[in-house]
Amino acid sequence: MEGNDLDKYRFPKTLSEQNRIIGLPLDEAIPAAVVLLWGFFTKKYLFSLIIAAVIWQLIRAAKCGKSSRWLYNWCYWYLPTELFRVVYRVIPDSSFRKWIK
């Protein structure tokens, strides 16, 4: 492969490398950022900062050192499927727990 061909691909330094925002994984950063933005627009800066920190700690405690994929899988199996229809148009309902071949 030449230099131009390699530019098409992304090679992570480690296998566990994942996208991060300010050092936080996306599943921890996005809920906290939403709360911070809400607090910014409603001018409740300190309240939103405290709530964002609490949400961040709750997500970290729920994960218990597991990966982000574990949290996504837990949400798929235990939360209503309608929550995922926004992102995933074709996703089977989690109540159908048997694989169909």
Curated annotation (Swiss-Prot):
Role noted for this protein: Membrane protein involved in F pilin formation.
* Gene that this sequence comes from: traL
Top-level taxon in the UniProt lineage: Bacteria
Q: Name one GO biological process term.
A: pilus assembly
Query: Which keywords does this Swiss-Prot/TrEMBL entry list?
Result: Cell outer membrane, Conjugation, Membrane, Plasmid
Recorded hits in Pfam families, A to Z, give: TraL
Q: How does it sit in the membrane?
A: Peripheral membrane protein
Cellular component terms (Gene Ontology): cell outer membrane
User: Which compartments is it annotated to reside in?
Assistant: Cell outer membrane
Task: Tell me which InterPro entries the record gives.
Answer: Pilus_assmbly_TraL, T4SS_TraL
Q: Does the keyword Membrane apply?
A: yes
Q: Which organism is it from?
A: Salmonella typhi
Stated name of the protein:
Protein TraL
